[in-house]
Amino acid sequence: MVKNKGLGRGLSSLLGEEVLPIKSEIVQIINIDKIKPNENQPRKHFEYNKIKELADSILNNGLLQPIIVDNNFQIIAGERRWRACKLAQVLEIPVIIKNFDTRESMETALIENIQRTDLTVMEEARGFKYLVDNFNYTVEKLAERLGKSRSHIANLLRLNNLPQSIQDKLNENILSMGHARCLINHEYAEEIANHIINHDLNVRQTEALVRQWHKNEYKKSTNNTNKVGKLCFKDNIIDNDLELLVKALSKKFGIKITIDNCNLGGKLMFHYKDLEELDLILSKLN
């Protein structure tokens, strides 16, 4: 039997409590239809391909690690294995029944899942929020119980304040946690998020963009038939083609030329010292 390194070691180290190895538990064979997923399970997204791979393995080798359930046959740990067994059309599976109350079940399910590398940031954040909202956990208590830093817990909890559309982009890895943190509690978070995606901004560029916003370095377009101002962000991020164009124009006219680029367009600016230089620019333009 394969030793479950993630669960056994994880519970011992994170909860500071002794966790009995599987061999000391009573394993029962239960009809798979009696087993129910935990509605408070932090993990909400299961990749079909990975479940299918696990199902194929179970068909060839059997379920090597029993699923842990509570007295109501609700899954505490092992929902991926349960889903794989369902996909493989396994009728009966080995389970270990734990006499846990709701609090213990949720804690165990959360801890079992946050040890997995494929848990999304938002799934982890929602799991933390559930414990805070339902069991009066503080950031300090969560950090102590989970073996995480207080700053990590606090930062993830704040992600729950993001609009749902941005949370979805986090789950889909369209935006990173670094991007999302810049948008927390921002009035125009969704508009800025779309700008980040459309312009492929990194976190450093996103931070600069938000700083510009707070310094009022943005404009509102008046060309909106719905009279809703469209945001125009100053990028200060010029792609290579634009940069080469500016250098070529500066060389051609012999003056300083700058470009102010934003998501709705931009401005090309000629800098002249006096009217004589302005006349020279105009003559070259003609």
Curated annotation (Swiss-Prot):
Name the SUPFAM superfamilies on file.
KorB DNA-binding domain-like, ParB/Sulfiredoxin
- Is Magnesium one of the keywords UniProt gives this record? no
Q: Which UniProt keywords apply?
A: Chromosome partition, DNA-binding
UniProt superkingdom:
Bacteria
Annotated GO biological processes are: chromosome segregation; positive regulation of sporulation resulting in formation of a cellular spore
- List the CDD domains hit by this protein, alphabetically: SPO0J_N
**GO cellular component terms, semicolon-separated:** chromosome
Q: Which molecular function terms from Gene Ontology are attached?
A: DNA binding
Q: What does this protein do?
A: Involved in chromosome partition. Localize to both poles of the predivisional cell following completion of DNA replication. Binds to the DNA origin of replication.
Please identify the protein, giving its name as recorded.
Probable chromosome-partitioning protein ParB
- Gene name? parB
